[in-house]
Protein backbone atom coordinates (compact mmCIF):
# COMPACT_ATOMS: atom_id res chain seq x y z
CA UNK A 1 0.00 0.00 0.00
CA UNK A 2 1.21 3.48 -0.84
CA UNK A 3 1.83 6.06 1.86
CA UNK A 4 0.98 9.75 1.58
CA UNK A 5 2.76 11.30 4.56
CA UNK A 6 4.26 14.21 2.62
CA UNK A 7 0.94 14.91 0.87
CA UNK A 8 -0.84 15.00 4.23
CA UNK A 9 1.73 17.45 5.60
CA UNK A 10 1.47 19.61 2.48
CA UNK A 11 -2.32 19.68 2.75
CA UNK A 12 -2.18 20.69 6.41
CA UNK A 13 0.13 23.54 5.44
CA UNK A 14 -2.19 24.66 2.62
CA UNK A 15 -5.51 24.48 4.48
CA UNK A 16 -5.23 27.76 6.43
CA UNK A 17 -3.92 29.59 3.36
CA UNK A 18 -6.47 28.70 0.65
CA UNK A 19 -10.21 27.88 0.85
CA UNK A 20 -10.31 24.17 1.61
CA UNK A 21 -6.57 24.05 1.00
CA UNK A 22 -7.00 24.01 -2.79
CA UNK A 23 -7.60 26.33 -5.74
CA UNK A 24 -10.41 24.31 -7.33
CA UNK A 25 -12.96 22.29 -5.31
CA UNK A 26 -12.67 18.87 -6.96
CA UNK A 27 -8.96 18.75 -6.07
CA UNK A 28 -9.86 18.53 -2.37
CA UNK A 29 -10.85 14.82 -2.81
CA UNK A 30 -13.96 15.34 -0.65
CA UNK A 31 -16.12 13.08 -2.82
CA UNK A 32 -13.68 10.20 -2.25
CA UNK A 33 -13.35 10.85 1.50
CA UNK A 34 -9.60 11.35 1.68
CA UNK A 35 -7.00 14.10 1.68
CA UNK A 36 -5.71 15.17 -1.72
CA UNK A 37 -2.51 13.78 -3.18
CA UNK A 38 0.04 16.48 -3.99
CA UNK A 39 1.77 15.94 -7.33
CA UNK A 40 5.38 16.84 -8.10
CA UNK A 41 6.05 15.99 -11.73
CA UNK A 42 4.73 14.15 -14.76
CA UNK A 43 6.16 12.60 -17.90
CA UNK A 44 4.21 10.98 -20.70
CA UNK A 45 1.29 8.98 -19.32
CA UNK A 46 2.75 8.92 -15.80
CA UNK A 47 2.52 11.27 -12.84
CA UNK A 48 4.49 11.25 -9.57
CA UNK A 49 3.45 12.56 -6.16
CA UNK A 50 5.64 14.23 -3.54
CA UNK A 51 5.92 10.94 -1.62
CA UNK A 52 7.57 9.36 -4.67
CA UNK A 53 4.57 7.27 -5.74
CA UNK A 54 4.10 6.68 -9.47
CA UNK A 55 0.76 6.42 -11.28
CA UNK A 56 -0.66 5.93 -14.74
CA UNK A 57 -2.56 9.20 -15.12
CA UNK A 58 -6.11 9.42 -16.48
CA UNK A 59 -6.71 12.94 -15.14
CA UNK A 60 -4.17 14.69 -17.39
CA UNK A 61 -4.81 18.04 -15.69
CA UNK A 62 -8.57 17.48 -16.34
CA UNK A 63 -8.08 17.02 -20.07
CA UNK A 64 -5.57 19.50 -21.53
CA UNK A 65 -2.58 17.15 -21.75
CA UNK A 66 -3.56 15.20 -24.86
CA UNK A 67 0.15 14.67 -25.64
CA UNK A 68 0.81 13.53 -22.08
CA UNK A 69 2.91 15.27 -19.44
CA UNK A 70 5.94 17.37 -20.40
CA UNK A 71 5.90 16.58 -24.12
CA UNK A 72 9.44 17.15 -25.40
CA UNK A 73 8.47 19.42 -28.30
CA UNK A 74 6.09 21.52 -26.21
CA UNK A 75 8.64 21.92 -23.40
CA UNK A 76 11.46 22.87 -25.78
CA UNK A 77 9.37 25.49 -27.58
CA UNK A 78 8.17 26.89 -24.25
CA UNK A 79 11.78 27.34 -23.15
CA UNK A 80 12.54 29.24 -26.36
CA UNK A 81 9.48 31.47 -25.95
CA UNK A 82 10.15 32.15 -22.27
CA UNK A 83 13.65 33.42 -23.03
CA UNK A 84 12.11 36.03 -25.35
CA UNK A 85 9.58 37.26 -22.79
CA UNK A 86 6.52 35.90 -21.01
CA UNK A 87 3.98 38.59 -21.86
CA UNK A 88 3.95 41.79 -23.90
CA UNK A 89 0.43 43.22 -23.69
CA UNK A 90 0.72 43.64 -27.45
CA UNK A 91 -0.10 41.48 -30.49
CA UNK A 92 2.33 38.72 -31.42
CA UNK A 93 2.61 36.37 -34.38
CA UNK A 94 2.14 33.43 -32.01
CA UNK A 95 -1.53 34.44 -31.57
CA UNK A 96 -2.00 34.45 -35.33
CA UNK A 97 -0.38 31.04 -35.76
CA UNK A 98 -2.68 29.42 -33.21
CA UNK A 99 -5.73 31.26 -34.56
CA UNK A 100 -5.00 29.99 -38.08
CA UNK A 101 -4.74 26.42 -36.83
CA UNK A 102 -7.96 26.63 -34.80
CA UNK A 103 -9.88 28.16 -37.73
CA UNK A 104 -8.52 25.50 -40.08
CA UNK A 105 -9.66 22.62 -37.88
CA UNK A 106 -12.91 23.78 -36.22
CA UNK A 107 -15.75 23.83 -38.78
CA UNK A 108 -17.80 26.59 -37.12
CA UNK A 109 -14.99 29.06 -36.49
CA UNK A 110 -14.27 31.76 -39.06
CA UNK A 111 -12.98 34.29 -36.51
CA UNK A 112 -11.62 33.50 -33.02
CA UNK A 113 -10.89 35.52 -29.86
CA UNK A 114 -8.36 34.15 -27.37
CA UNK A 115 -9.05 34.46 -23.62
CA UNK A 116 -7.55 32.92 -20.47
CA UNK A 117 -9.97 30.18 -19.37
CA UNK A 118 -12.96 28.14 -20.40
CA UNK A 119 -15.12 30.17 -18.03
CA UNK A 120 -14.05 33.39 -19.76
CA UNK A 121 -14.90 31.82 -23.10
CA UNK A 122 -18.43 30.79 -22.12
CA UNK A 123 -19.18 34.06 -20.29
CA UNK A 124 -18.03 36.03 -23.33
CA UNK A 125 -20.00 33.83 -25.74
CA UNK A 126 -23.20 34.42 -23.76
CA UNK A 127 -22.66 38.18 -23.75
CA UNK A 128 -22.07 38.01 -27.48
CA UNK A 129 -25.22 35.94 -28.05
CA UNK A 130 -27.31 38.41 -26.07
CA UNK A 131 -25.75 41.43 -27.74
CA UNK A 132 -26.07 40.00 -31.24
CA UNK A 133 -29.70 38.85 -30.89
CA UNK A 134 -30.98 41.59 -28.59
CA UNK A 135 -32.51 38.88 -26.39
CA UNK A 136 -31.94 37.97 -22.75
CA UNK A 137 -32.52 34.28 -22.01
CA UNK A 138 -30.14 31.35 -22.31
CA UNK A 139 -31.07 27.66 -22.38
CA UNK A 140 -28.63 25.20 -20.80
CA UNK A 141 -28.77 21.53 -19.80
CA UNK A 142 -28.76 19.95 -16.37
CA UNK A 143 -25.41 18.33 -15.62
CA UNK A 144 -23.51 20.31 -18.25
CA UNK A 145 -20.84 22.52 -16.70
CA UNK A 146 -19.86 25.72 -18.46
CA UNK A 147 -17.59 27.32 -15.89
CA UNK A 148 -18.38 29.41 -12.85
CA UNK A 149 -19.95 32.49 -14.44
CA UNK A 150 -23.11 33.70 -12.69
CA UNK A 151 -25.31 33.09 -15.74
CA UNK A 152 -24.29 29.44 -15.82
CA UNK A 153 -24.23 28.41 -12.15
CA UNK A 154 -27.94 27.75 -12.40
CA UNK A 155 -30.09 24.75 -11.48
CA UNK A 156 -33.53 23.87 -12.80
CA UNK A 157 -36.71 25.15 -11.19
CA UNK A 158 -39.50 22.88 -10.03
CA UNK A 159 -41.05 22.32 -13.45
CA UNK A 160 -39.89 21.64 -16.97
CA UNK A 161 -38.37 24.73 -18.59
CA UNK A 162 -39.13 26.92 -15.59
CA UNK A 163 -37.03 29.95 -14.76
CA UNK A 164 -33.70 28.94 -13.24
CA UNK A 165 -32.64 29.12 -9.61
CA UNK A 166 -29.15 30.03 -8.30
CA UNK A 167 -26.90 27.00 -7.83
CA UNK A 168 -24.50 28.89 -5.57
CA UNK A 169 -24.79 31.60 -2.93
CA UNK A 170 -23.81 34.91 -4.50
CA UNK A 171 -25.69 34.35 -7.76
CA UNK A 172 -28.60 36.84 -7.82
CA UNK A 173 -32.05 35.44 -8.56
CA UNK A 174 -32.47 38.17 -11.16
CA UNK A 175 -29.52 36.69 -13.06
CA UNK A 176 -30.72 33.12 -12.60
CA UNK A 177 -34.15 33.92 -14.01
CA UNK A 178 -32.65 34.55 -17.43
CA UNK A 179 -31.23 31.03 -17.61
CA UNK A 180 -33.47 28.05 -18.36
CA UNK A 181 -32.29 24.54 -17.47
CA UNK A 182 -33.69 21.34 -18.98
CA UNK A 183 -32.52 17.69 -18.90
CA UNK A 184 -29.76 16.70 -21.33
CA UNK A 185 -30.94 14.57 -24.27
CA UNK A 186 -34.59 15.59 -23.59
CA UNK A 187 -35.92 17.15 -26.79
CA UNK A 188 -39.48 17.38 -25.50
CA UNK A 189 -38.33 19.76 -22.76
CA UNK A 190 -36.29 21.75 -25.27
CA UNK A 191 -39.29 22.18 -27.56
CA UNK A 192 -41.43 23.28 -24.62
CA UNK A 193 -38.81 25.88 -23.65
CA UNK A 194 -38.88 27.28 -27.18
CA UNK A 195 -42.68 27.40 -27.13
CA UNK A 196 -42.71 29.30 -23.84
CA UNK A 197 -39.68 31.58 -24.17
CA UNK A 198 -38.52 31.42 -27.79
CA UNK A 199 -39.02 35.12 -28.52
CA UNK A 200 -36.48 36.04 -25.82
CA UNK A 201 -34.08 33.10 -26.23
CA UNK A 202 -30.66 34.43 -27.23
CA UNK A 203 -28.73 31.18 -27.14
CA UNK A 204 -28.69 27.48 -26.40
CA UNK A 205 -25.39 26.38 -24.84
CA UNK A 206 -24.56 22.69 -24.73
CA UNK A 207 -21.63 20.32 -24.32
CA UNK A 208 -21.96 18.22 -27.51
CA UNK A 209 -20.75 15.36 -25.32
CA UNK A 210 -21.51 16.06 -21.68
CA UNK A 211 -18.22 15.68 -19.84
CA UNK A 212 -19.03 16.92 -16.36
CA UNK A 213 -21.49 14.23 -15.34
CA UNK A 214 -19.16 11.50 -16.49
CA UNK A 215 -19.03 11.03 -20.26
CA UNK A 216 -22.54 11.22 -21.71
CA UNK A 217 -22.82 11.28 -25.52
CA UNK A 218 -25.82 12.84 -27.25
CA UNK A 219 -28.67 10.55 -28.21
CA UNK A 220 -29.20 10.15 -31.98
CA UNK A 221 -30.97 13.23 -33.34
CA UNK A 222 -30.44 15.38 -30.24
CA UNK A 223 -27.83 17.78 -31.63
CA UNK A 224 -29.52 17.79 -35.04
CA UNK A 225 -32.81 18.94 -33.50
CA UNK A 226 -31.05 21.61 -31.43
CA UNK A 227 -29.58 22.94 -34.66
CA UNK A 228 -32.96 22.92 -36.40
CA UNK A 229 -34.83 24.59 -33.54
CA UNK A 230 -32.25 27.33 -33.04
CA UNK A 231 -32.08 28.16 -36.74
CA UNK A 232 -35.87 28.25 -36.97
CA UNK A 233 -36.11 30.57 -33.96
CA UNK A 234 -33.20 32.95 -34.66
CA UNK A 235 -31.42 31.65 -31.54
CA UNK A 236 -27.66 31.06 -31.52
CA UNK A 237 -26.46 27.50 -30.96
CA UNK A 238 -23.34 27.54 -28.78
CA UNK A 239 -21.18 24.43 -28.46
CA UNK A 240 -19.11 24.39 -25.29
CA UNK A 241 -16.15 22.36 -26.55
CA UNK A 242 -13.81 23.39 -23.75
CA UNK A 243 -13.54 19.70 -22.86
CA UNK A 244 -14.49 17.99 -26.14
CA UNK A 245 -12.45 20.28 -28.40
CA UNK A 246 -9.73 18.15 -30.05
CA UNK A 247 -10.55 15.28 -27.69
CA UNK A 248 -13.58 13.82 -29.43
CA UNK A 249 -12.13 14.24 -32.90
CA UNK A 250 -9.57 15.96 -35.12
CA UNK A 251 -12.24 18.52 -36.00
CA UNK A 252 -13.67 18.50 -32.45
CA UNK A 253 -17.09 17.07 -31.52
CA UNK A 254 -18.85 19.21 -34.11
CA UNK A 255 -16.78 17.61 -36.83
CA UNK A 256 -17.39 14.12 -35.46
CA UNK A 257 -21.17 14.63 -35.34
CA UNK A 258 -21.45 16.81 -38.44
CA UNK A 259 -23.29 19.64 -36.66
CA UNK A 260 -22.05 23.21 -37.07
CA UNK A 261 -23.01 25.62 -34.27
CA UNK A 262 -23.02 29.42 -34.50
CA UNK A 263 -20.43 29.84 -31.73
CA UNK A 264 -17.88 27.49 -30.19
CA UNK A 265 -16.06 27.76 -26.86
CA UNK A 266 -12.65 26.13 -26.49
CA UNK A 267 -10.02 25.68 -23.78
CA UNK A 268 -7.97 22.88 -22.21
CA UNK A 269 -6.23 21.19 -25.20
CA UNK A 270 -5.69 24.45 -27.11
CA UNK A 271 -3.47 25.64 -24.26
CA UNK A 272 -1.37 22.50 -24.02
CA UNK A 273 -1.51 22.63 -20.22
CA UNK A 274 -1.29 26.40 -19.81
CA UNK A 275 -4.24 28.68 -18.92
CA UNK A 276 -6.23 29.45 -22.06
CA UNK A 277 -9.69 29.73 -23.54
CA UNK A 278 -11.17 30.86 -26.84
CA UNK A 279 -14.50 31.51 -28.46
CA UNK A 280 -15.23 31.83 -32.13
CA UNK A 281 -17.81 31.43 -34.84
CA UNK A 282 -19.36 33.07 -37.85
CA UNK A 283 -17.64 36.24 -39.01
CA UNK A 284 -20.83 38.32 -38.95
CA UNK A 285 -21.34 37.44 -35.27
CA UNK A 286 -17.73 37.70 -34.11
CA UNK A 287 -17.28 41.11 -35.72
CA UNK A 288 -19.69 42.49 -33.13
CA UNK A 289 -16.88 42.16 -30.55
CA UNK A 290 -14.73 45.20 -29.71
CA UNK A 291 -12.80 46.73 -31.33
CA UNK A 292 -14.66 45.64 -34.49
CA UNK A 293 -18.06 46.12 -32.87
CA UNK A 294 -19.83 47.38 -29.74
CA UNK A 295 -19.79 44.24 -27.54
CA UNK A 296 -16.97 44.61 -25.04
CA UNK A 297 -14.52 41.93 -23.94
CA UNK A 298 -10.84 42.25 -23.05
CA UNK A 299 -8.03 40.57 -21.10
CA UNK A 300 -4.58 41.58 -19.88
CA UNK A 301 -3.02 38.17 -20.55
CA UNK A 302 -5.25 37.06 -23.44
CA UNK A 303 -3.15 35.54 -26.20
CA UNK A 304 -0.02 35.50 -24.03
CA UNK A 305 3.05 34.00 -25.72
CA UNK A 306 3.43 30.99 -23.43
CA UNK A 307 -0.14 29.72 -23.79
CA UNK A 308 -0.09 30.36 -27.55
CA UNK A 309 3.16 28.43 -27.90
CA UNK A 310 1.97 25.44 -25.87
CA UNK A 311 -1.34 25.38 -27.73
CA UNK A 312 0.19 25.62 -31.17
CA UNK A 313 2.88 23.02 -30.48
CA UNK A 314 0.18 20.68 -29.15
CA UNK A 315 -2.26 21.04 -32.03
CA UNK A 316 0.40 20.89 -34.72
CA UNK A 317 1.42 17.41 -33.53
CA UNK A 318 -2.10 15.96 -33.61
CA UNK A 319 -3.06 13.97 -36.71
CA UNK A 320 -6.07 11.98 -37.85
CA UNK A 321 -4.11 8.83 -36.97
CA UNK A 322 -4.01 9.89 -33.31
CA UNK A 323 -7.79 9.78 -33.16
CA UNK A 324 -7.90 6.32 -34.70
CA UNK A 325 -5.46 5.29 -31.95
CA UNK A 326 -7.69 6.88 -29.30
CA UNK A 327 -10.65 4.89 -30.63
CA UNK A 328 -8.75 1.62 -30.29
CA UNK A 329 -7.28 2.48 -26.92
CA UNK A 330 -10.55 3.87 -25.55
CA UNK A 331 -12.48 0.78 -26.59
CA UNK A 332 -9.82 -1.44 -25.00
CA UNK A 333 -10.15 0.47 -21.71
CA UNK A 334 -13.96 0.65 -21.67
CA UNK A 335 -14.42 -2.98 -22.69
CA UNK A 336 -11.73 -4.17 -20.29
CA UNK A 337 -13.24 -2.37 -17.31
CA UNK A 338 -16.69 -3.65 -18.22
CA UNK A 339 -15.43 -7.23 -18.48
CA UNK A 340 -13.84 -7.24 -15.03
CA UNK A 341 -16.88 -5.54 -13.48
CA UNK A 342 -19.02 -8.33 -14.91
CA UNK A 343 -16.67 -10.92 -13.39
CA UNK A 344 -17.58 -9.58 -9.95
CA UNK A 345 -21.26 -8.80 -10.68
CA UNK A 346 -20.74 -5.07 -10.19
CA UNK A 347 -23.48 -2.89 -11.71
CA UNK A 348 -21.84 -0.54 -14.19
CA UNK A 349 -22.22 1.40 -17.40
CA UNK A 350 -19.40 2.42 -19.73
CA UNK A 351 -19.32 5.14 -22.36
CA UNK A 352 -16.73 6.63 -24.68
CA UNK A 353 -16.31 9.65 -26.93
CA UNK A 354 -12.93 9.91 -28.64
CA UNK A 355 -10.24 9.98 -25.95
CA UNK A 356 -12.77 10.35 -23.10
CA UNK A 357 -14.04 7.26 -21.24
CA UNK A 358 -16.89 7.10 -18.73
CA UNK A 359 -17.32 4.34 -16.12
CA UNK A 360 -20.41 4.60 -13.92
CA UNK A 361 -21.37 2.31 -11.04
CA UNK A 362 -25.03 2.02 -11.99
CA UNK A 363 -27.10 -0.51 -13.90
CA UNK A 364 -28.84 2.27 -15.85
CA UNK A 365 -27.96 3.51 -19.30
CA UNK A 366 -26.62 6.99 -18.55
CA UNK A 367 -28.14 9.58 -20.87
CA UNK A 368 -28.66 12.51 -18.49
CA UNK A 369 -27.77 13.85 -15.05
CA UNK A 370 -30.53 11.94 -13.26
CA UNK A 371 -29.16 8.67 -14.64
CA UNK A 372 -25.59 9.61 -13.69
CA UNK A 373 -26.79 10.51 -10.19
CA UNK A 374 -28.04 6.95 -9.68
CA UNK A 375 -24.40 5.81 -9.48
CA UNK A 376 -23.12 4.25 -6.27
CA UNK A 377 -20.93 7.09 -5.00
CA UNK A 378 -19.82 5.22 -1.89
CA UNK A 379 -18.58 2.32 -3.99
CA UNK A 380 -16.82 4.72 -6.36
CA UNK A 381 -14.92 6.30 -3.44
CA UNK A 382 -13.68 2.88 -2.33
CA UNK A 383 -12.76 1.94 -5.90
CA UNK A 384 -10.88 5.21 -6.36
CA UNK A 385 -8.75 4.57 -3.26
CA UNK A 386 -7.96 1.00 -4.29
CA UNK A 387 -6.92 2.11 -7.77
CA UNK A 388 -4.74 4.88 -6.34
CA UNK A 389 -2.88 2.38 -4.15
CA UNK A 390 -2.50 0.12 -7.18
CA UNK A 391 -0.84 2.90 -9.19
CA UNK A 392 -3.72 4.34 -11.22
CA UNK A 393 -4.67 8.02 -10.92
CA UNK A 394 -8.35 8.53 -11.73
CA UNK A 395 -10.41 11.72 -11.52
CA UNK A 396 -11.58 11.90 -7.87
CA UNK A 397 -15.26 12.09 -8.80
CA UNK A 398 -17.79 9.67 -10.26
CA UNK A 399 -18.99 12.55 -12.42
CA UNK A 400 -15.73 13.03 -14.32
CA UNK A 401 -14.46 10.96 -17.21
CA UNK A 402 -11.05 9.43 -17.79
CA UNK A 403 -8.75 11.05 -20.35
CA UNK A 404 -6.29 9.36 -22.68
CA UNK A 405 -3.14 10.81 -24.23
CA UNK A 406 -0.99 9.91 -27.20
CA UNK A 407 1.54 8.57 -24.67
CA UNK A 408 -0.78 5.95 -23.17
CA UNK A 409 -0.05 2.45 -24.44
CA UNK A 410 -1.93 -0.83 -24.65
CA UNK A 411 0.28 -2.02 -21.79
CA UNK A 412 -0.95 0.92 -19.70
CA UNK A 413 -4.54 -0.03 -20.44
CA UNK A 414 -3.94 -3.67 -19.58
CA UNK A 415 -2.24 -2.65 -16.31
CA UNK A 416 -5.26 -0.48 -15.49
CA UNK A 417 -7.76 -3.22 -16.23
CA UNK A 418 -5.78 -5.67 -14.10
CA UNK A 419 -5.69 -3.10 -11.29
CA UNK A 420 -9.48 -2.81 -11.54
CA UNK A 421 -9.73 -6.60 -11.26
CA UNK A 422 -7.65 -6.53 -8.07
CA UNK A 423 -9.67 -3.61 -6.72
CA UNK A 424 -13.00 -5.33 -7.34
CA UNK A 425 -11.72 -8.56 -5.81
CA UNK A 426 -10.82 -6.72 -2.59
CA UNK A 427 -14.05 -4.72 -2.50
CA UNK A 428 -16.26 -7.78 -3.01
CA UNK A 429 -14.72 -9.74 -0.12
Swiss-Prot record:
Pathway: Porphyrin-containing compound metabolism; protoporphyrin-IX biosynthesis; 5-aminolevulinate from L-glutamyl-tRNA(Glu): step 2/2. One of its GO terms (molecular function) is transaminase activity. Keywords: Cytoplasm, Isomerase, Porphyrin biosynthesis, Pyridoxal phosphate. GO terms for cellular component: cytoplasm. Its main location: cytoplasm. It comes from the Bacteria. Gene3D superfamilies: Aspartate Aminotransferase, domain 1, Type I PLP-dependent aspartate aminotransferase-like (Major domain). The modification N6-(pyridoxal phosphate)lysine is found at residue 268. It catalyses: (S)-4-amino-5-oxopentanoate = 5-aminolevulinate. The keyword Cytoplasm applies. CDD domains: OAT_like (cd00610). It holds the Pfam family Aminotran_3. It is an enzyme of class 5 (isomerase). Its cofactor is pyridoxal 5'-phosphate. The keyword Cytoplasm applies. GO terms for biological process: protoporphyrinogen IX biosynthetic process. It is found in: Cytoplasm. Its EC number is 5.4.3.8. Belongs to the class-III pyridoxal-phosphate-dependent aminotransferase family. HemL subfamily. Homodimer. This is Glutamate-1-semialdehyde 2,1-aminomutase 2. The lineage of its organism: Bacteria, Bacillati, Bacillota, Bacilli, Bacillales.
